[in-house]
Design a protein with these regions (language model features):
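ATP/NTP phosphate-donor binding region
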Residues: 1-99
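Short glycine/serine/threonine-rich phosphate/pyrophosphate-binding segments
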Residues: 107-114, 135-136, 253
């Protein structure tokens, strides 16, 4: 078992990585939190695959377990689902010494974490991420949130889990679209600060998913360790942590305009990275050839190349609600080159012309 620690003083927590780890969930939780009750939150994609195994492991060590299964998809990450979870927790009389366990991808982790942060002013929280996106990104760092019709992740909190269990075997059941969903975030890490990861992806992308699964341990370690280091330095997203949002300004605007029913988040991030890098390279802000190198990798990974047919004015309007904004100022993450990024203060006018064909297909 490999363990990466997110170092946050008294709130530090371990991220354990091991094949077959879901079967040890009960043992790991009891060792960390003692004799408690556990509410498992999952969705109707993940529950049929892993709920029985996880609940059985908990009951085997004497934990008291209740569970709830929600519809899958980004549309579930809403205030109505939050209300459903609050009612469920009250119905089962969870106390402050008990735990909410998120079993699923980024939507379930983000959603389940908010009642963990706020029910009874905070209960224990455990993440069991089963998608690539959740394992490398959303389960690490304590961001929990739901969406509003006006934008993504607009109601949320910073609430660190006490334990994260990453089982790479769960990635074998991902459909191709969920696999690409995670790859968008993986490429992001290589772009902003880990060129060794970027090269690892370049070396293996041609072999498809099989080749990437052959080095999945290295990929997970690169991503999780990088994010843990960033979170340790900037837990509340006021500076350095903003760099993790490379590609996300455009991505969130696309998702908002599509009402979270279009492409997967990681696919939208890939488009955002393509567009912003093409634009900054043309402006002389990014080393020549960076955009082409990024596009070659994203193409090899099967990521989308074209922005959806959304009016540019709608995308620009959605950007005004971006969480990285400060007043009318928008903070955009750009690349100097692969592996080196910066935060650029600007405004939405920076993105004028982003839907031009030269920026969305090279």
């Amino acid at each position: 078992m490999q363990t990466i620690t997110v170092p946050l003083g008294e709130r530090s927590y371990p991220i354990h990585i091991e094949r077959g780890l879901l079967a040890k969930t009960g043992e790991m939780i009891r060792e960390k939190l003692g004799d408690i009750a556990v509410a498992v939150v999952s969705d109707d994609h993940v529950a049929p695959l892993y709920m029985e195994e996880v609940v059985s492991s908990m009951e085997k060590v004497g934990l008291r377990v209740c569970s709830i299964v929600l519809p899958h998809g980004e549309q579930t990450k809403c205030l109505k689902s939050l209300e459903t979870l609050y009612a469920f927790l009250c119905e089962h009389h969870l106390t402050r010494k008990d735990a909410i366990v998120a079993l699923g991808g980024g939507v379930i982790g983000d959603l389940a974490g908010l009642p963990a942060a706020t029910s009874l002013r905070g209960v224990h929280f455990v993440q069991l991420p089963t998608t690539l996106l959740a394992q490398v990104d959303s389960s690490v760092g304590g961001k929990v949130a739901v969406d509003l019709p006006q934008g993504k992740n607009l109601v949320g909190a910073f609430y660190q889990p006490e334990l994260v269990l990453v089982d790479p075997d769960s990635l074998r059941t991902l459909t191709d679209d969920f696999w690409r969903d995670g790859l968008g975030e993986v490429v992001k890490y290589g772009c902003i600060g880990d060129e060794a990861l970027f090269r690892l992806l370049e070396e293996n992308a041609g072999g498809g998913r099989t080749a990437l699964m052959g080095v999945i341990g290295e990929i997970l370690t690169h991503c999780i360790q990088y994010k843990a280091n960033i979170v340790a330095q900037d837990e509340h997203d006021t500076g350095l942590r903003m760099t993790l949002n490379f590609g996300h300004t455009i991505a969130h605007a696309v998702e908002t305009c599509q009402h979270y029913t279009g492409m997967r988040h990681g696919e939208a991030v890939a488009l955002g990275m393509r567009v912003i890098t093409a634009m900054t390279e043309e402006k002389g802000m990014t080393e020549q050839g960076t955009s082409a190198r990024l596009n070659r990798l994203l193409d090899a990974l099967g990521m989308p190349r074209r922005l959806p047919a959304i009016p540019e004015k709608d995308l620009l309007n959605a950007m005004t609600l971006d969480k990285k904004s400060a007043g009318k100022q928008l903070r955009v993450i750009t690349l100097d080159k692969i592996g080196v990024c910066r935060i650029v203060p600007t405004d939405v006018d920076f993105f004028q012309g982003m839907t031009a064909q030269k920026f969305v297909q090279n």
